[in-house]
């Protein structure tokens, strides 16, 4: 294989081409590749940060959800206690009202009994006076009669 002038010319042209590429083509390509690597690295870092933020947010949501559940359970328990208290108060009031009604009924019955006794005493007294008049066949003094009847009624 002979080295001739064409081969030397091609070698010089290739050297100029390599120098031209290293001077004008290679730096923008390296800069573009470096910029792309930086953007990819920034994107990966942002993704990692977002993943960490998501994990923190999920933990916070779980914590707040647990707190809300606990608060809801506490409110339900408090409502149940209040309902039981209201039921007990209603029972107490109903018992007191029943006792009051029973007492009023007892007083009304006692009053009716006393009224009936008084009426019966008056009827017995009137019958006694009528019987005494028939036996004695004379009119008894009304004031003396009333006094005797009052004493008799007091004894009954």
UniProtKB/Swiss-Prot annotation:
Coarse class of the protein's main subcellular location: membrane
Stretches that traverse the bilayer: 5-25
Native source species: Acinetobacter baumannii (strain ATCC 17978 / DSM 105126 / CIP 53.77 / LMG 1025 / NCDC KC755 / 5377)
Keyword presence, Translocase: no
InterPro entries: ATP_synth_B-like_membr_sf (IPR028987), ATP_synth_b/b'su_bac/chlpt (IPR002146), ATP_synth_F0_bsu_bac (IPR005864), ATP_synthase_B_chain (IPR050059)
CDD domains membership: ATP-synt_Fo_b
UniProt protein name: ATP synthase subunit b
Keywords on record: ATP synthesis, Cell inner membrane, Cell membrane, CF(0), Hydrogen ion transport, Ion transport, Membrane, Transmembrane, Transmembrane helix, Transport
Superkingdom as given in the UniProt entry: Bacteria
GO terms, molecular function: proton-transporting ATP synthase activity, rotational mechanism; proton-transporting ATPase activity, rotational mechanism
């Amino acid at each position: 294989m002979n080295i001739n002038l064409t081969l030397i010319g091609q070698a010089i042209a290739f050297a100029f081409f390599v120098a031209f590429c290293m001077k004008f083509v290679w730096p923008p390509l390296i800069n573009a590749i470096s910029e792309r690597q930086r953007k990819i690295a920034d994107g990966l870092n942002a993704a990692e940060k977002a993943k960490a933020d998501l994990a923190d947010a999920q933990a916070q949501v779980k914590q707040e959800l647990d707190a809300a559940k606990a608060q809801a359970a506490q409110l339900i328990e408090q409502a149940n206690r209040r309902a039981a208290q209201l039921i007990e108060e209603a029972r107490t009031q109903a018992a007191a009202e029943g006792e009051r009604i029973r007492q009023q009924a007892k007083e009304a019955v006692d009053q009716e009994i006393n009224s009936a006794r008084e009426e019966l005493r008056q009827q017995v007294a009137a019958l006694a006076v009528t019987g005494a008049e028939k036996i004695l066949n004379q009119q008894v003094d009304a004031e003396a009669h009333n006094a005797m009847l009052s004493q008799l009624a007091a004894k009954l």
